[in-house]
Amino acid sequence: MKRTYQPKKQRRNRTHGFLKRSKTPGGRNVLKSRRAKGRKRLTTRAPKK
């Protein structure tokens, strides 16, 4: 049986990335709260190659 989670960097970033978060009011709240908390990473990102 195939497992449910088949990770893909591109899909992860498109779904949970900065641009997607910036588009919706709720996503902007997420960014705002993570900035206020002082998070080093606001959203997911592809590691540098």
UniProtKB/Swiss-Prot annotation:
**Keywords on this record?**
Ribonucleoprotein, Ribosomal protein
UniProt keyword annotation of Ribonucleoprotein present: yes
Pfam families in alphabetical order: Ribosomal_L34
A GO molecular-function annotation: structural constituent of ribosome
Q: Kindly give the InterPro entries that the UniProt entry links to this protein.
A: Ribosomal_bL34, Ribosomal_bL34_CS
Biased composition of type Basic residues is found at 1-23, 31-49
Which terms under GO biological process does the entry name? translation
Q: Which superkingdom is the protein from?
A: Bacteria
From the UniProt entry, list the residue stretches annotated as the region Disordered: 1-49
One Gene Ontology cellular component: ribonucleoprotein complex
**NCBIfam families in alphabetical order:** rpmH_bact
- Describe the family membership recorded for this protein in Swiss-Prot or TrEMBL: Belongs to the bacterial ribosomal protein bL34 family.
Name-wise, this protein is Large ribosomal subunit protein bL34
Source species: Anaeromyxobacter dehalogenans (strain 2CP-C)
UniProt lists the gene as rpmH
